[in-house]
Amino acid sequence: INTITYDAGNTTINKYATFMESLRNEAKDPSLQCYGIPMLPNNSSTIKYLLVKLQGASQKTITLMLRRNNLYVMGYSDPFNGNCRYHIFNDITGTERTNVENTLCSSSSSRDAKPINYNSLYSTLEKKAEVNSRSQVQLGIQILSSDIGKISGQSSFTDKTEAKFLLVAIQMVSEAARFKYIENQVKTNFNRDFSPNDKILDLEENWGKISTAIHDATNGALPKPLELKNADGTKWIVLRVDEIKPDMGLLNYVNGTCQTT
């Protein structure tokens, strides 16, 4: 498995853009695309996982593990007392859990477990972060960098600290790879913190639906109008692929053929 690294503690807009490009290239199925938008592989691809190593201020690191076919974050690891410490969401079970353990920390003799005692749903992460909505958790490179330091190598931290880090990391890594719109919001606000707007939250919740609509489009026309949201929360009706294409980074896997260009 290839590890994609990103140093949030020492970065530029271009370096973040390169990180996004590398992540999309590692994740996508090279033989699949609809209307020029790359698509993720189905779940039987040979390489099933991706590792993303994030570095924060003062060289602290956290490695996220993503499921390649949908970019879900399954858990993360950090160096702790000379060992590799792994943290896995509690909705990852059975053989998959063992796979995550072994992928995050390959040496069974020098690893520690600190399980995430909740699941990876946004509603759960919001509850643990003690917010009503993730729109209340600010995103930004500085926040990502300092959040890494609050967890990496620390003997203890609260669920609140961890859930806030996960909300930031999931959106700035996985969601930004899925949606160029989110990547562009990070770039536009690069030297400041920002709250995710209504369009960000709405895209995040509708990625599967949007992917299917694009896949099923005929000559660029969606099978039916897609009702989404603008940044200010007003209704955004999408009728054609080219209206939403600039916002897309990767499509979720959809079975069957589509128009490739």
UniProtKB/Swiss-Prot annotation:
It comes from the Eukaryota. Disulfide bonds join C34-C258, C84-C105. N-glycosylated. Loss of glycosylation does not affect DNA-cleaving ability. Loss of glycosylation does not affect protein synthesis inhibition, but increases adenine polynucleotide glycosidase activity likely as a consequence of the increased accessibility of substrates to the active site pocket in the absence of glycosylation. The active site is at Y72, Y122, E175, R178. Expressed in leaves (at protein level). Keywords: Disulfide bond, Glycoprotein, Hydrolase, Plant defense, Protein synthesis inhibitor, Toxin. Belongs to the ribosome-inactivating protein family. Type 1 RIP subfamily. This is Ribosome-inactivating protein PD-L1/PD-L2. The lineage of its organism: Eukaryota, Viridiplantae, Streptophyta, Embryophyta, Tracheophyta.
